[in-house]
Amino acid sequence: MALLADATKTCERLQILRTIAEGAEEAKAIESLRVELAEFATSVNGLACSGALFHENGVSLSAVSDLANTQESVQKSLERFLKAPKATTLRQGTRWTTLTAKLETLVDKTKVAQSGDWQRHFEQHFFGGLPPAKREATLAKTPENERALKRYRELYQSFIQYRTKPPTSAEDFQKLHLLSQQLTAIKFQEDVPEAVRKFL
């Protein structure tokens, strides 16, 4: 009898260990999926923050065509997972690959749209003068122009960085507006007589 009792206890322990091992594997599989989704969540959150900042500062944003479709896929995946919280629920068939492909497409299209929206806004609403080298080529080399050109170069260097790297805060937008105003305010001496221009 003692042997039967020991065997029964051993079987029960083995069953508990098996359940623990299966639970550990399931937890590992779910963690892997969570990490993958967290990367998309970080990207989407960053784009949402920059979109909100753009909107607050008057940048017109284009609609992203895949947004509603992707939201629906995420919602369906969540509902399925809440009914059966296992990694296999998410990975069944092509659900996971379809979901991640939609998220990747959404992130890519949103980045492209925001970049284009920023480029248009920058060109339409900020200083549109010539780069310093081109501006210098049109000026007589008077002391006044040299001083103005030096200031122009300094401001333009800080200003032009925003063309490809949009502001990331309200303070950056304020700085950009100030740079644009300062560049616009710089006046060059352009009415130099031709004889003086040749001499300089």
Show where each model-derived region lies.
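Amphipathic alpha-helical assembly segments used for oligomerization, scaffolding, or translocation
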Residues: 1-200
